[in-house]
Amino acid sequence: MDIFRVLTRGASVKKESGPKAKAADYSVINGNDENHKEDNNESQIVKELDFFRNKRIISKVEDDREKTTENDSPNKEEKSGNDDGLIKPVITNTVEASALRKSYKGNVSGIDIPLPIGSFEDLISRFSFDKRLLNNLIENGFTEPTPIQCECIPVALNNRDVLACGPTGSGKTLAFLIPLVQQIIDDKQTAGLKGLIISPTKELANQIFIECFKLSYKIFLEKKRPLQVALLSKSLGAKLKNKVVSDKKYDIIISTPLRLIDVVKNEALDLSKVKHLIFDEADKLFDKTFVEQSDDILSACREPSLRKAMFSATIPSNVEEIAQSIMMDPVRVIIGHKEAANTNIEQKLIFCGNEEGKLIAIRQLVQEGEFKPPIIIFLESITRAKALYHELMYDRINVDVIHAERTALQRDRIIERFKTGELWCLICTDVLARGIDFKGVNLVINYDVPGSSQAYVHRIGRTGRGGRSGKAITFYTKQDSVAIKPIINVMKQSGCEVSEWMDKMAKMTRKEKESIKNGKAHKERKQITTVPKMDKAKRRRQQEMIAASKRRKNEELSKKHFSK
């Protein structure tokens, strides 16, 4: 399979046809045409979400659905429909449920836990699942639920609070979007905001928005009103504040915390009637950076029957405590281990001795043929990311760097080049560890050891997505002796083979845990460079001589000026 073909499964704009998505506020009104494009032979691969070009993807989704099926094969109807020869599993009792959970290492706890589903068709008999929604799932290549979807969808459709943890790329987004769309279809009340999804980053919010649009396509509510989804952009926020757009126009809104709070405080958006509140990447939304904002959002949602859901690839103990305090009899769903990485990822540690050794290690990967693009390299700071970029660029590696200091247009162009295969390697910081969602990445390199096990899981989760395999390599030096201990724990919990010395490594002491938590385990690192020390000293002396010469000239000029 051409990996860059997989990577570039984004969409392009065809402005001449199809209903246009409103670019100003990212709101979506579903179309009503009846012809659909059949999935190709790679339909099992989840389509890539180009979050920097959401308007373009929306147009593509609409265009694809408007194309006729004149060239479709005669057997297309049989392929798109249910195969009578295929027996879909239906879970009818707790014994079958236990067997299913054991098969995917699911750990579900709580009071009166609903039975999981064995297939999407199972939802029709159990929950009167909307056939238009099921059709949208199948047309987008989602034919079978993933383990986390098997558990979370029936829990949510029973109107229960849920705390869910699953590996990166395990289908968590659909696990909360499918029941949300179904519950809004079932709600026969008047129009108004019913579903609210909170994401820590704009990129992730864009991604959720695109998926929600695909699911809600051609779904109509009361009086033939289309289900409306919106991404709370700066433009839409201004329209809500100025009353250009009614806050009752949308059924689902997706937003980052600060932007939502700004609109709510200006009384431009009423959250008191919201019935479904979802926190994606809950571990980030309830850490010290976002916890106050998340609390403000919870306070604004005053509906007595409010259903709350939290999803993430990692669930620290403090997030579990918060969940228990704000949720009503929640069902806790853990797929695999809550601190483990995706089992499709081969994890490896490489000792480099010092900072110079890391550059040598990358060059060895290139020479040995392990540097297989597409590749993402993570570093701990923007300064170090820039330095590594310059080093690899001079090695003639097809590389670019993306970080918070780059403009939106620059990030847009870099992502586009990476998707099309023009770029082989992308260097970035932790700021984008949760936002980038490419399905074809072969290798992730942690040039710097991550600051926590959660950061490590999210970093390496950029590969091994959609059921494909991937590889993650972490470089470490002598000064990382404490910082790598959480990484080794994640590797063990993920079922990776570890060296004998890793098994014999002493457990972390309380002092070491505190140092990692407070960021003290990561000491100041040397500059990334291959320039010899003698050359550095020579350059430094030259710079000092130039500075001294300029200083003398300025002093002479000032003396002449005052003497006059």
From Swiss-Prot:
ATP binds at residues 166-173. GO terms for molecular function: ATP binding; ATP hydrolysis activity; ATP-dependent activity, acting on RNA; RNA binding; RNA helicase activity. It catalyses: ATP + H2O = ADP + phosphate + H(+). Its main location: nucleus. InterPro entries: DDX52/Rok1_DEADc (IPR044764), DEAD/DEAH_box_helicase_dom (IPR011545), DEAD_box_RNA_helicase (IPR050079), Helicase_ATP-bd (IPR014001), Helicase_C-like (IPR001650), P-loop_NTPase (IPR027417), RNA-helicase_DEAD-box_CS (IPR000629), RNA_helicase_DEAD_Q_motif (IPR014014). Residues 344-506 form the Helicase C-terminal domain. Residues 13-23, 33-45, 62-86, 553-564 have a biased composition (Basic and acidic residues). It is found in: Nucleus, Nucleolus. One of its GO terms (cellular component) is small-subunit processome. A motif (Q motif) lies at residues 122-150. Belongs to the DEAD box helicase family. DDX52/ROK1 subfamily. ATP-dependent RNA helicase involved in 40S ribosomal subunit biogenesis. Required for the processing and cleavage of 35S pre-rRNA at sites A0, A1, and A2, leading to mature 18S rRNA. May also have a gene-specific regulatory function since it affects nuclear fusion by regulating KAR4 expression and contributes with KEM1 to ISP-1 sensitivity. The Q motif is unique to and characteristic of the DEAD box family of RNA helicases and controls ATP binding and hydrolysis. This is ATP-dependent RNA helicase ROK1.
